[in-house]
């Protein structure tokens, strides 16, 4: 089993030194869902929310979250993000919204945390904007789907796979 990289030999938390790693193109894709009452989803899709365009605001919040990941997660490196694509897809048949985020950079470390953070922030923004009408919403299945670049190369979650070991 691989060792945890954020601890030194004394067991103290530290930021991993990526200074000697080459800069490569890196990409990560994450997804997550927010389940809600059908009436809440209809309100969002109709654009009738008094706070404004829920999905548009959530998209911008998620992009901002990707850019601020190093400020939120203590041992993350600040990364020059080159692209964020955040798509919010209403799924009326399941009474939920899917968030899928792709983040890219050219750098010495990956953007998995940025993709996961962007996804969470977008979903949290939907919750915040709609909690007055539906406090029972549930953020679910936030996970990494794919990462490309770096020493570990390409990793992709197997279809239907809920959990994965490092490969």
Swiss-Prot record:
One of its GO terms (molecular function) is cyclic pyranopterin monophosphate synthase activity. It is an enzyme of class 4 (lyase). GO terms for biological process: Mo-molybdopterin cofactor biosynthetic process. The keyword Nucleotide-binding does not apply. The keyword Repeat does not apply. Substrate binds at residues 75-77, 113-114. It comes from the Bacteria. InterPro entries: MoaC, MoaC_bact/euk, MoaC_sf, MoCo_biosynth_MoaA/MoaC, Mopterin_CF_biosynth-C_dom. Coiled coil: none annotated. SUPFAM superfamilies: Molybdenum cofactor biosynthesis protein C, MoaC (SSF55040). Catalyzes the conversion of (8S)-3',8-cyclo-7,8-dihydroguanosine 5'-triphosphate to cyclic pyranopterin monophosphate (cPMP). It comes from Methylococcus capsulatus (strain ATCC 33009 / NCIMB 11132 / Bath). Keywords: Lyase, Molybdenum cofactor biosynthesis. Its EC number is 4.6.1.17. This is Cyclic pyranopterin monophosphate synthase. Belongs to the MoaC family. Pathway: Cofactor biosynthesis; molybdopterin biosynthesis. The active site is at residue 128. Homohexamer; trimer of dimers. It catalyses: (8S)-3',8-cyclo-7,8-dihydroguanosine 5'-triphosphate = cyclic pyranopterin phosphate + diphosphate.
């Amino acid at each position: 089993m691989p060792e945890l990289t954020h601890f030194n030999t004394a067991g103290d938390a530290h930021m991993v030194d990526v200074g000697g790693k080459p800069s490569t193109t890196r990409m990560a894709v994450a997804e997550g869902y927010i389940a809600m009452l059908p009436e809440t989803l209809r309100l969002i899709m109709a654009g009738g929310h008094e706070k404004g365009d829920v999905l548009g605001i959530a998209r911008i919040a998620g992009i901002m979250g990707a850019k601020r990941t190093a400020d939120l997660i203590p041992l993350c490196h600040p990364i020059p993000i080159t692209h964020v694509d955040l798509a919010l897809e209403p799924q009326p048949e399941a009474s939920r919204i899917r968030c899928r985020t792709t983040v890219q950079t050219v750098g010495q470390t990956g953007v998995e945390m940025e993709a996961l953070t962007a996804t969470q922030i977008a979903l949290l923004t939907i919750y915040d904007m709609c909690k007055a009408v539906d406090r029972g919403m549930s953020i679910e299945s936030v996970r990494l789907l794919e990462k490309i670049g770096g020493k570990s190369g390409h990793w992709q979650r197997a279809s239907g796979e809920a959990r994965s070991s490092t490969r």
